[in-house]
Amino acid sequence: MLSKVIRAAATAFAIGTAAIAVAGIALTVPAQAAVRSAVGKPLNEAKSLAASSSYSAALARVSAAEAVPNLTPEERSVISAMRQYIEVKSGTGSLGVKAKFANDYNAKRYRDVINDGELLRKNGGLDASSMQIIAQAYYLLGDYHGCSRYIMNNFGNGGGEEVMKLQMRCAYESQDNESMRTALETLVARTNKPEYWSQLLNAAQSTKGLSDHQTLDIYRLKLLTGTITKADDYNLLAQLALQLGFAAEAQAVIEKGIAAKVLSGDRTTRLLTMAQKQAGANAAKSAAALAAANASPNGDALVKLGEDTWGQGQGHYPDAIKLIQQGLQKGPTDKDNALIRLGVAYYSAGQKDQAVRSFEKADGDAKQKIIAHLWAIFARTH
């Protein structure tokens, strides 16, 4: 199921085939202004030779015009324009190679586009934009492995958003789920755009066998990344928090949904009242809960109490960190979960480096590792 969601994300990134152009290239014979006959004669000969595809001879006549003494600025301009024109027609020189590259792409001669890359390199015209077009040519030829290989060899992990979208699309066509996930994570890390976060979190949510707690974490991240927009999502997040004993968090979520004008009506009122009532009850028995957690043979209760304290919001994060640390020292039955809780509390307290280190230590259970990895990406990008 996970691969299907990632693959669905990949299909959303269409590959364009718009025409490309090379700026500043003369594609017509340059008009000859007033020049001396010593300059005009070899240029006229060059024009005739170029018309018959005798490009080497034509360039030789341009060189003859350049050799005329005391050239005026206007004469130099006409000579330069003629040379550019011949280079474009012949596909030689820097401008000519660029023109050939553009013409080959626009004519859908994608194999020639790939071969043009070496000519561009030799003439100093192979830039990031050209390499992206070459990678796209591989894709349009159906050579998806070649496309991915070209991107890795020429961009590594340094490609821009469009390059990474192309990499993801190639991975999709190659049935390479791991590369698709990596490309999507890179898009998230590079752009921090909600649309990519939504795809990544939906992919994680489709993992089989997630616990309610792990699903709660995914919805927490959806809220933090601005990818919750529907009432059902707000309600599910609040209900999961309430179900797992985090009433203060549930109350805060509902209030955010109301403020965003997404939640309203009797159902919202009932859910908010329930959360407020439970949060009040939890606060009233907090001292007893702490005593029971300290008396417990393991650190689970302290970790959970710390998570609930975190859910109470700004001003409570230092206490949450302390409680979770005590739970870790005592020994929780699920150390990965405790490390994730500590990382979230660290992040909320503004201690991003400690948060990332804590997330990275949660590497035991495979599903917990997914959740920890998502939190680590979030901490690095926010």
Regions found by a protein language model. Name each.
Residues L2-V5, A9, F13, A18-V35, ...:
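Long, contiguous interaction/recruitment modules in multidomain scaffold/adaptor proteins
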Residues K4-A8, F13, V22-Y110, N115, ...:
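N-terminal leader/linker segments that initiate helical-solenoid repeat arrays
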Residues A34-N44, P73-I79, K89-A99, R109-D112, ...:
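Generic helix N-cap/helix-start motif at coil->alpha-helix transitions
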Residues A46, Q84, F101, A135, ...:
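Conserved small-residue packing positions in alpha-helical repeats and bundles
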Residues L49, E87, D104, Y138, ...:
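Residue at a conserved register position within TPR or TPR-like alpha-solenoid repeats
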Residues S52, S90, A107, L141, ...:
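Structural motif corresponding to the intra-repeat A-B loop/turn of tetratricopeptide repeats
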Residues R61-A64, T92-F101, R111-L120, Y144-F155, ...:
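Alpha-helical repeat scaffolds
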Residues N298-H382:
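C-terminal soluble interaction/assembly domains
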